[in-house]
Swiss-Prot record:
Alphabetical list of PROSITE patterns matching this protein: CHH_MIH_GIH
Protein name: Molt-inhibiting hormone
Record keywords: Disulfide bond, Hormone, Neuropeptide, Secreted, Signal
Source taxon at top rank: Eukaryota
Protein source organism: Penaeus japonicus
Gene Ontology annotations of biological process type: circadian rhythm; neuropeptide signaling pathway
Length: 105
């Protein structure tokens, strides 16, 4: 019985530590694997992801943050969020930033 409890506890610790490695502790946000150009461009990534965060706060829809970030922000939801955040006048700047984040794909 004691061995089973220890094995269960060890398995839980391994899972918790393993999943914690998937999170960026500096920003406490999930590392987006779809954007290959994030490394070296974290400042751009933070500016673009802020649009999705603002949109999620505006609409409060479950899953909206993921839909906005889908395909490294190259989707219709990101454009909707850009308009909802009243930042559509900056669309050309965001297109350049998104192309940088999508570099290498």
């Amino acid at each position: 019985m004691y061995r089973l409890a220890m094995r269960t506890w060890l398995a839980i610790v391994i899972v918790v530590v393993g999943t914690s490695l998937l999170f960026d502790t500096a920003s406490a946000s999930f590392i987006d694997n779809t954007c290959r150009g994030v490394m070296g461009n974290r400042d751009i990534y933070k500016k673009v992801v802020r649009v999705c965060e603002d949109c999620t706060n505006i609409f409060r829809l479950p899953g909206l943050d993921g839909m906005c970030r889908n395909r490294c922000f190259y989707n219709e939801w990101f454009l909707i969020c850009l308009k909802a955040a009243n930042r559509e006048d900056e669309i050309e700047k965001f297109r350049v930033w998104i192309s940088i984040l999508n570099a290498g794909q």
